[in-house]
């Protein structure tokens, strides 16, 4: 069975990329157990708590990231350097319990995946 990586690179609520990526991730998890999720670049903002998308008339899908462990999606990673660049290095509470790892480690992990989807 193929290993599939989902990479979130965009800010939440600015476009449909994050929501569509999450929908694809949940659908794919029903077909395979070998799924990894990576939050890099502006994608690290996807996991910030207390977002208020209703103020810009957007759907609040962020809380759905909390259910990933229920779908047996346990390989979730945040890029350490991207958190620092966005002033989030001291944030220790995200909506998903993702491991904070260096960019180099993310690159090393991605090599093990057969398919990489970017949102």
Swiss-Prot record:
Keywords recorded for this protein, A-Z: Cytoplasm, tRNA processing
One biological process term in Gene Ontology:
tRNA processing
Pfam families cross-referenced by the UniProt entry: DsrE (PF02635)
Q: Which cellular compartments is it found in?
A: Cytoplasm
Predominant location: cytoplasm
Q: Which Gene3D superfamilies match?
A: DsrEFH-like
Q: Which GO terms describe its cellular component?
A: cytoplasm
Checking SUPFAM superfamilies in the record gives:
DsrEFH-like
Has UniProt tagged this entry with the keyword tRNA processing?
yes
Q: Which PANTHER family match?
A: PROTEIN TUSC
**Function according to Swiss-Prot or TrEMBL:** Part of a sulfur-relay system required for 2-thiolation of 5-methylaminomethyl-2-thiouridine (mnm(5)s(2)U) at tRNA wobble positions.
- Which family is this protein grouped under? Belongs to the DsrF/TusC family.
Subunit record text: Heterohexamer, formed by a dimer of trimers. The hexameric TusBCD complex contains 2 copies each of TusB, TusC and TusD. The TusBCD complex interacts with TusE.
Write the protein's name.
Answer: Protein TusC
Source organism per UniProt: Photorhabdus laumondii subsp. laumondii (strain DSM 15139 / CIP 105565 / TT01)
């Amino acid at each position: 069975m193929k290993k599939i990586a989902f990479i979130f690179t965009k800010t939440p609520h600015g476009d449909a990329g994050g929501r569509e990526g999450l929908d694809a991730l949940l659908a794919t998890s029903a077909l395979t157990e070998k799924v990894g999720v990576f939050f890099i670049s502006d994608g690290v903002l996807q996991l910030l708590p207390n977002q208020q998308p209703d103020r810009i008339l957007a759907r609040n899908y962020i809380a759905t990231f909390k259910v990933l462990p229920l779908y047996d999606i346990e390989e979730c990673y945040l890029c350490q350097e991207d958190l620092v660049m966005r002033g989030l290095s001291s944030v220790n509470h995200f909506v998903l319990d993702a491991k904070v790892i260096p960019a180099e480690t993310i690159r090393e992990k991605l090599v093990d995946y057969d398919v990489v989807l970017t949102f």
